[in-house]
Amino acid sequence: SPTQLDVYFIVDEHAKVEVRKITFLGNRHATDEDLRGVMATQEGNWLSFLTSAGTYKEDAFERDVLLLTAFYYDHGYVTVKIGKPTVEMSPDKRFLYISIPIEEGDIYKLGKLDFQGELLLTKEEMLAGLKVKPGEQFNRSKLGQDIQNINNFYKNRGYANVNVTPLTQIDADKKIVDLTFDLQQGKKVYFERINVRGNTKTRDYVIRREFDSVEGDPSNRALIDRAERKLRDLQFFK
């Protein structure tokens, strides 16, 4: 009719595009197999029609670049550079060929370790508790574990807002990374009141008795987590 407009969409559906090959350019130490192993994007194979293997997803591929960087950081390559990948499609638009340029750089070891800021223990005691050690190959995941452990140590003693910042100094000539943990503990936090909301299964005191702390105690992350596990074990709540 003169007052209506019909709109038609013509869809030309193609077969699923498959990642045929991933090529790494410039990797002298890490093998292609190692690098492909950390990526979410995988090359297609004869079982690809049954699984998602070989499927190209742009968001997953963007994460892959971060995963490759993390892999190198965990193996001492603190100056690694992952270049912009190139993605080429086959003439029949069925396959993708991906090339990823890499500048690995050199392996770095840990040099001097130190602490600064607001310490709850002596520097010697804090250093003794670290997993990372001077002279060993730099490993960012291992460093992350130490940062988490320091966070937990402070949060279990009332410092719920502690801030742990790793400060690095890279010596390109000696191939070492000096590392200083800067600790800002913030104000000490106490349990003022334990409130129970949304409970329709039992009396509130049944829930409160699962806490190993009382009102007025310093906040303690470990005790909060333990109370949560004990409450789950009661099977009253989801």
Language model: regions and residue ranges:
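Interaction-mediating elements
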Residues: 1-234
